[in-house]
Structure formats: structure tokens, C-alpha cells
């Protein structure tokens, strides 16, 4: 089983959006038996909170299924159990390197690196641009799917 873990600052905007977008792509490809997807936070700030309402609205508008959830923090077990750990920006990467003691198993990447681009998924919590975040996330998730399934 390929285990993909998306990580962002608080686990209420970008990483849950990526989780639900990726789950939708995996389901539409009929690959649920091969790929599991989850998300978590690199910080404690939003632990216990559900996906941010504007993200839920956008997912609903796009026809992407989502569930009620609670933000959770990245753990050492996440590192051991995940095949790919995918952050959204350089801050996430720094946090993940710190939390994994330098990523010795080379599991950490940034989402848009999968598309060949060297840029971040901007945090819509600050930009209020959920549509652009969605487009970047969808593009990155599609590239991941192509990259992990031969």
C-alpha cells in the first residue's frame, strides 16, 4: 500500500484540501486498494479544528467529497508509516526536516515539485485565494498519481 501524507502549517486549509482532492482522484482511478491518503499539521495551532469553512465550500462547489475531521499533529509514527510526506511550502519542509531529524529516509517533498515546478502552494489562510490553492493542489495531486503508479 502506498501511503501519502500531506502536511501544512495547521492542517485546516491546504493539507486537508490536498487530502480530499487526492482521495477523489484515487477513487476515480479505482486505486483505493493501492493508495491511502491522509493529512496532518506541522504545528499545534489548529489541532482539533475541522477543515476551514472556505475550503469546505470550495470542495463542495467542485464536487469533491469531504468528511468532518479534526486537525492533528505530525508524529514519528507518521514518518515511519508514510511512503510519501508532502508539504506545501518551504516552511513546511523546514518543519518536517526538524520533526524527522533531517528526513533520513528521503520521504519529504513539496507538492509542486511533483509537477516539475519549484514553487509553493500559497496559504489561502493569508491570501484568501482558495481557487488558486485548489488549482495548484489539483495539479500537484494529478502529478503525484502519475508519479507513483507506473
Which residues make up each language-model segment?
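Conserved active-site segments centered on acidic
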Residues: 1-81, 146-150
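Phosphate-binding/catalytic loops
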Residues: 84, 90-150
Amino acid at each position: 500500500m502506498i501511503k501519502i501524507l500531506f502536511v501544512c502549517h495547521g492542517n485546516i486549509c491546504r493539507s486537508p484540501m490536498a487530502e480530499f482532492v487526492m482521495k477523489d482522484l484515487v477513487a476515480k482511478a479505482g486505486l483505493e486498494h493501492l493508495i491511502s491518503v491522509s493529512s496532518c499539521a506541522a504545528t499545534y495551532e489548529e489541532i482539533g479544528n475541522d477543515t476551514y469553512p472556505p475550503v469546505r465550500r470550495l470542495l463542495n462547489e467542485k464536487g469533491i467529497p469531504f468528511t468532518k475531521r479534526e486537525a492533528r499533529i505530525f508524529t514519528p509514527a507518521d514518518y515511519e508509516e508514510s511512503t510519501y510526506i508532502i508539504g506545501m511550502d518551504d516552511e513546511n519542509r523546514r518543519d518536517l526536516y526538524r520533526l524527522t531529524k533531517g528526513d533520513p529516509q528521503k520521504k519529504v517533498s513539496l507538492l509542486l515539485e511533483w509537477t516539475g515546478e519549484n514553487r509553493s502552494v500559497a496559504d489561502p489562510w493569508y491570501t484568501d485565494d482558495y481557487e488558486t490553492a485548489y488549482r495548484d493542489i489539483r495539479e500537484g495531486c494529478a502529478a503525484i498519481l502519475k508519479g507513483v503508479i507506473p
